[in-house]
Amino acid sequence: MQGSLRKEMWLPVLNDGGKVIGCIARSVSRSLPKKYYHPVVRVAVIYQGMLYLVNRGKKAFVSPDTMDYPFHSYVLFRHSIESTVRETMGSLGEKEELMPRFLIRYTFENERVKHLVNLYVMCVRSEEVMDRIKQPNGKLWTSRQIEENLGSGVFSEYFEQEFAYLQNTVLLAENFCKADC
């Protein structure tokens, strides 16, 4: 028992104000739907005015087998949001010039979870960096392609909630910048 507890992911439990009030094993939290409020980080990747999305996989706890950002993770107990962003991005998180920028914090809730989502965005400027991010199950999506598929089960529940905000902020600004180039 003790060995399995050491390997367990420990998640902070938040109050409704977003303050840490304790911790719980991820496996226990998942067995009690929506009972605990946990922080997560998500990183949107934008390249040439398009969003890069990958398949979440069939075993994903929320929105399995749907398209979503390549970087997302729980914030572990006693870890900062910023360190979680770096860890989630792997070797890309080591380069300061590639660090994503914080965009918005919101509460995501469905029948299984309640999460405090910290959404970041990374605007990739070079093909070399994009090649390091690419995964076999990933694809660049235009805003139009996304709009045509919203609500059809193609995208994760998180993404469905975030897209309008992204479209009216970062993607809009990115398209203005592209037009001036």
Label every PLM stretch briefly:
Residues 38-71:
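A glycine-rich, hydrophobic loop/mini-helix early in the fold
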Residues 27-31, 103-109:
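Short, solvent-exposed loop/turn elements at beta->coil junctions and helix N-caps
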Residues 64-67, 77, 104, 111-181:
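Nudix hydrolase/Nudix homology domain
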Residues 1-42:
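Acidic, metal-coordinating catalytic segment for phosphate/diphosphate chemistry
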Residues 26, 57, 134-135:
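Residue-level structural signal for beta-strand termini and adjacent loop
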Residues 29-32, 59-64, 139:
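A short local loop/turn or secondary-structure capping micro-motif enriched for an aromatic residue
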Residues 53, 68-103:
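The catalytic Nudix box helix
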